[in-house]
Amino acid sequence: MYKRQLLDTQTTGLSSKAEVCIFTRLAASKVGATTMDRPEWIASNPKKNEVCCCLTNNKNRGIKTNKGGDKVDVDKVNPRKNNKYGQIVRWSPQDNNHSSVYFEWDLFVVAGNPDVHDDNNKGSKNINEDNMFNSPDGLKFDKYGRLWIQTDGNYSNSGDFKGMGNNQMLIADTNTGKIKRFMVGPKECEVTGLTFAPDYKTVFVGIQHPGERLGSNFPDNGNNKPRSCIIAIQKKDGSEILT
């Protein structure tokens, strides 16, 4: 909201409202906005006054300034130096008004690897060996208020990422914090984008750049060239997903 925030020509040094709107990141830097760990998808819960945003990762957090010259010190919303795993921030605007300048926030989940680390790199309390992941990217609430999380991260299964598997899609209950893995993608892919059929009996999921390092021939296998695609997932009994 241009008129209600500090983003104007006086505070930013930009020459016009148009420049403030076009060069928003530069304008935000001028007024000292909080730097975030690579924001990706944002989703709003249709059943609850909350919005979530994926902060995918940030190898420079607490190490050096970003390309715009902003400091990227460790802080409450970006709590880890050299953030390898990412986190999801959640906020609730005052009076259920998304144009409000006041809101409450927390970290819904901090991704990590409890098999490798026993410090804050193990992740938040709702991360365990069965649902651990890194680099949350895609994000969507369904009509029931369930949060779907998709990843675009490190699939090496070595070092800090030992045992984390391929990129994946998980489902979360933002009331309880519980997170479960729903599906795992093929080797060397990003799982990105999802939508549901109107009857919620099918979920469509994007599989991007499988075999990008020549480690997979998905979806045709054999010696065929790997290709991005959309997959459709249904239950064997034909009922709604997750009922």
Give the role of each language-model region:
Residues 3-243:
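Sequence/structural signature of beta-propeller domains
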